[in-house]
């Protein structure tokens, strides 16, 4: 073992809402830090050697699936992309993300929220044209394809929702993920909906007009999506529709 290795302390808020006797409490774990150790690696070592009951989510381990998002020292992050060495004092406090239903410990149900959001903004291409799978796909200009791709990189991790002050106060708020999803289809030429159609979906206080422009979503997005400009553009377009009514 190298003399340069240090011992880190990981504090986890543990709670099983399905238990009649379990109460929320912090539990501390100490472990030796290794080079390039991520929180994901640390949590796996804790579960393997210290606490097999510890619950947290992961799938890809590469910042692609978004499953391992959690509150790290008060900020939503992906465990698989967060190095333990980035915390100088070696003390890391982990909690489940707010605004989502708690499953157990660090595991939350983001799936139901994103499923509901998908239905609310009707996030699929709307077209009056009858589908004909024998036809060549409609040509899309490279600039448009790039703009759509940029907004479509969302991995549904929930970091933007967990960091949103409006979401904490307004449970039905659609959040940055919902507004970004709406904008993604507004700029897609495959979708034939008008701005008026989108206004019916996101043109209220639970939609784009509920945003307080704190931009925590933009600051915490692990994929660095252009949420600030996306939300601003959506708000301007919805404002024009509202004024015309």
UniProtKB/Swiss-Prot annotation:
Cysteine pairs forming cystine bridges in this chain are none
The positions annotated for binding [3Fe-4S] cluster are 164, 211, 217
Which residues are involved in binding [4Fe-4S] cluster? 154, 157, 160, 221
* Gene name of the record: frdB
Q: Which lineage do the record's taxonomy fields give for this organism?
A: Bacteria, Pseudomonadati, Campylobacterota, Epsilonproteobacteria, Campylobacterales
Any single GO molecular-function term of the entry would be:
2 iron, 2 sulfur cluster binding
Coiled coil spans: none
Entry cofactors: [2Fe-2S] cluster; [3Fe-4S] cluster; [4Fe-4S] cluster
Record protein name field:
Fumarate reductase iron-sulfur subunit
E.C. no: 1.3.5.1
